[in-house]
Amino acid sequence: MASLGHPATFGRATHVVVRALPESLAQQALRRTKGDEVDFARAERQHQLYVGVLGSKLGLQVVQLPADESLPDCVFVEDVAVVCEETALITRPGAPSRRKEADMMKEALEKLQLNIVEMKDENATLDGGDVLFTGREFFVGLSKRTNQRGAEILADTFKDYAVSTVPVVDALHLKSFCSMAGPNLIAIGSSESAQKALKIMQQMSDHRYDKLTVPDDTAANCIYLNIPSKGHVLLHRTPEEYPESAKVYEKLKDHMLIPVSNSELEKVDGLLTCSSVLINKKVDS
């Protein structure tokens, strides 16, 4: 089954699902710590630029879902669906206030003719932000939002891949401090909890991954894409936001690097991967 996760196709995408920001996000979105207020106009501009990079610049077909004021966190579409090849797992987010976000995502993915699996077990919780797919296997963070039963249902859904669980400490999600920066490359933050999680992933895996260590945990959340006309593409946080981490990304000479601002959504725990669901549709379907 290893060919399914062949690194040559890792990062390929044809479509991206995103969702507009509701104005309720500024005051009502969930956040781990009370901090600076969200500048909503700026958040919208940053989100539009992010969507523009994925659509206009990189050529993905954008499926744009409308905002829902009753769902202040709905821009963070990553948490409600895990898509791998032609299958989509509609999750059961750990925060009860977010569960209705899955409805519109399910409709959108049905229109794209993916095989839909719904997480209906009331004992299961899973946020997509806790799911790291490496192209070879899944790592699932066990956090305040994702539990063992959620990880088991993910494993049942994607049977072709090994699934390992990783305890998440001092962070909202597994991908709050790591992500894939290339076909075999894990971007990881420098904090003790991030490094501990990486060690567990390395112990769990039969495969040896390269690592890219960045000083700032949140800057370790980046988006890698393999675009046939452009090659390796990486969306990462800007030098203005994270100068030291940006310097690390700038050493990746084989990648087309696209710095993206995300200062406003980060105030409500949103990182780069949070606001999109990437899908690779076969051309003939």
From Swiss-Prot:
Keywords: Acetylation, Hydrolase, Metal-binding, S-nitrosylation, Zinc. Zn(2+) binds at residue 274. It catalyses: N(omega),N(omega)-dimethyl-L-arginine + H2O = dimethylamine + L-citrulline; N(omega)-methyl-L-arginine + H2O = L-citrulline + methylamine. Optimum pH is 7.8. GO terms for molecular function: amino acid binding; dimethylargininase activity; zinc ion binding. The keyword Metal-binding applies. Gene3D superfamilies: L-arginine/glycine Amidinotransferase, Chain A (3.75.10.10). The modification N-acetylalanine is found at residue 2. The active site is at 173 (proton donor), 274 (nucleophile). Copurifies with a tightly bound zinc ion. Activated by release of zinc. His and other agents that promote the release of bound zinc ions activate the enzyme (in vitro). Inhibited by S-nitrosylation. Zinc protects the protein against S-nitrosylation. Widely distributed, highest concentrations found in brain, brain cortex and kidney (at protein level). One of its GO terms (biological process) is citrulline metabolic process. Disulfide bonds: none annotated. Substrate binds at residues 30, 73, 78-79, 98, 145, 268. The modification S-nitrosocysteine is found at residues 222, 274. The keyword Membrane does not apply. Pfam families: ADI. Hydrolyzes N(G),N(G)-dimethyl-L-arginine (ADMA) and N(G)-monomethyl-L-arginine (MMA) which act as inhibitors of NOS. Has therefore a role in the regulation of nitric oxide generation. Monomer. Belongs to the DDAH family. This is N(G),N(G)-dimethylarginine dimethylaminohydrolase 1. It comes from Bos taurus (Bovine). The lineage of its organism: Eukaryota, Metazoa, Chordata, Craniata, Vertebrata.
